Structure formats: C-alpha cells, structure tokens
Amino acid sequence: MHRDVRNSGGELIVDEAFIDYCPDATVRHHVQDGLTVVGSLTKILCIPGVRLGYICAAPEQIARLQERAVTWSLNVLASAVAAELPRHQAEIAADAQANQARAERFARCLQEMGVRVTAGCVPFLLADFGHDMTKTVQHLRAQHILVRTCDSFGLPANYLRLAVKTDAENDLLMKVLYRENFDAR
C-alpha cells in the first residue's frame, strides 16, 4: 500500500495509537520517505487526559513537522509519565495480554448470544446484533452504560463498538444487552 501511495505522490500516515495491544503488528521500524507512523504512549495506560505520543518518520518529514511544532508540546504531567514508562514495560505487556484474554472471553459470550463479533488485538469489539440497536443504546445510557454507535464509521444501527473492560464490567454489559435484546423474543 505504501508503494502505491508514494507512487501517486501521496504520503501514508499509520495510526498506531493502540499498538501496545498488538506490538508485533507495528510498522514503525519500516519508516521511509512517504510513510509516517504516529502512536500514543498513554492508551494502554488508560490515562486519557495525558497527551503523550510520538511520530516516526523520515528525517526530512520530522524537520518539516518541527518547523510547525508548538513551543510547549509536552506538559509537565506527560513528561513525568514519559520518564516512568521504561520501568513499567513488563506490566504494560502483561496488561495487554490480560486484555486480549478478556476480549476473547467477551467475544465468545457475545457470540453465544448470537451476536456476530469482529475482534482484533485492540481493546474494542465490533458487534453486529443483526437489528437496530438505537433503543438499546438509549436504555444503556439511562443506566449509565456507554457504548459507541458505529454510524460515524458508516455502519448501520445494528453495529456497536464495545470497549473491553474488566470481566465484571463486561458481564454486566452482556447481562443488560441480553435483557434488552433477547429476553423479549
């Protein structure tokens, strides 16, 4: 794909924000002219207020980006987090593996309910319930359970993107989804 984009005069930007969940899939070691990789150092840590990321690109691209960079691109909190990251690599890898196991269990349980699930190595599942989920999403919201609809992805209302949480949180969501969608049938 990169070659095709480069040959057409374009540049390819790869978003690896969740790459810590599937580190073998990274392309950051293959950066060359016309290929830029952006990543986050805080997604796996679940600290959304901390903006800490990186860009891997050819030296010329980095120079162009530095010309436009703001003076204070890293705040003190993000800097402190960055300083601690190397000491926690084993924990981060273990968390990613544990999350994968939770995702596999969550997907199996949803599939047993008849939901078509597309899983990957990120902490989300794409779930096709086979019918419009608009009312279910409203009922979930009323119970302070938030799920992501997929209309902004161009998918119909029968799809939801479900975050993989703890087993207890996943079980609660499945219980409510079952009650909302399958008990009445």
Range-by-range predicted roles:
Residues 100, 112-143, 166:
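Conserved PLP-binding catalytic core of the aspartate aminotransferase-like
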Residues 1-12, 16-47:
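Active-site pre-lysine segment of PLP-dependent enzymes
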Residues 35-111, 115-118:
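PLP-dependent aminotransferase class I/II
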Residues 11, 116, 146:
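Residue-level detector of anion-binding/catalytic polar loops
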Residues 14, 39, 74, 147-149:
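Hydrophobic residues in well-ordered beta-strands that form the structural core
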Residues 49, 121-122, 154-158:
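Short acidic/glycine-enriched loop/turn segments that link adjacent beta-strands
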Residues 142-143, 152-185:
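PLP-dependent enzyme catalytic core of the Aspartate aminotransferase-like
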